[in-house]
Amino acid sequence: PAAVIQAVADIVADYNVIVCPGFQFSGIGTIATDNPDVDFILVDTNPTDSEGNDIECDNIYAMTFKEQEGGFFAGMAAALESESKKVAVVTGIAYPSNVNYQYGFESGVNYANEKYDTGVEIVEIPSYAGVDVTNKNVGGNYVGSFADEATGKVVGKALIDEGCDILFVAAGGSGNGVFTAAKEAGNVKVVGCDVDQYDDGANGSDNIILTSVLKVMSMNVEKQLNAIADGGF
């Protein structure tokens, strides 16, 4: 994150609007305060100062999403479609957005079990349990990185070996490894995350994607850029 924030600092004098996509940009608050004539669009996180304290800046438009809602429907879909009656969620790091996805998914499975008698088990491997920003163990299956395909594949294969036939993957680049594990298994479906991952699911003449949970971030960024162009913020 420090390198990311420095990258913003290096270019801030050259632009009127800077779009910062991702949680790693949350610490731009101090830069924004020091550059009140530059508008910042912060995607998928809220701004903090250099010490991680939440702040509000008139020149930062921060957009966040209710991941738990999309995760809920992913959980319902997984429970309703699972044939093995075992499903799981694989996430990257236990940041709030990922924990929201996890809890939403689990709630969706539990709801389907209660309302539709699906009888589906949520599989968690204790050695991959996540620890959130408050140092609380949140369970789940966390790769520990958003850019570790090798470990993603290991986690995915471990869950498949436990009998899971549907995996909800919210793990960034690490999720590519989970996709590979699912493709190699041949009888596993995956729920994609943030964008439509249908093309990523291609596996010969088949496709492993059951559905995808969308944030449609590009539309929200475009909307705010248009607002700035029209003189608003």
Residue ranges of each PLM-predicted region?
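A residue-level marker of the well-folded mature domains of exported/periplasmic proteins
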Residues: 1-233
